[in-house]
Amino acid sequence: MEIIKNKEFGGERPLFASHDLRLENVIIHKGESALKECSNIEAYECVFEGKYPFWHVDKFKIERCLFKEGARAALWYSRDLLMKDTMVEAPKMFREMINLELENVRIPFAQETLWHCHNVRIRKMDLEKADYLFMHSSDIDIKDYRQQGNYSFQYCKNVTISDADIDSKDAFWGTENITVMNSKLIGEYLGWHSKNLKLINCHIGGTQPLCYAKDLILENCTFDEDADLAFEYSSVVADIKGKITSVKNPRSGRIVADEIGEIIIDKNIKLPANCEIIQRKK
């Protein structure tokens, strides 16, 4: 493997079509497509300032690097990435990618990140300003994860999340086969139009959670006081610890909670309209 150390590059495609290359303490200045159409690339303690540095790359490792704000849309149309101990200050990272492993990565401006990505493994990640995160992605395994940003995980499939703190309006809309464990989910309109969403040992906050859901399961979950008007038009099996402020027109299934402040069943309920609702303290 060729090694380039302590160098600086800029302009258009300075390392285009490189193969079997390791970069150490390299700075990629303003320009475009520094490492486009490359394979078997390693970057260690490098700084990326220019746009689109890693497009159409096959097999690459990025460790202890910095992507500055100008390095937007840095990793697209690529596969087989391992990224560790890296700071990303640019938006629109990771698009149309396969086989990503991200460990100890921080993205403080993560808008429109991780779209159309498949087979993703994340361990220890912190994202802020992360609106429209994980759109149309699948086969995702996440642990030790912090996120602030709305409209996340929309239209995702086959996702497992544990030990997460997610602050997101409209999270998990239109998803299929999602399991979230030991996590905090704060944000209104959680999980609408989802299929096979399973929440285990989770805390839920925000108005009108989990409506229009199909085959929804909750095990040993808790609700904030503002998580009212839950389960409207959902088929649900839920075991809730503590109180739910209100439940409205669930379609079918079984809801068990210590206490429910208000149960709203009105003329607008949809068939089969046979959900069993049980309060342990009554």
Segments predicted by a language model, with ranges:
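Long, distal/terminal scaffolding or interaction modules
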Residues: 1-282
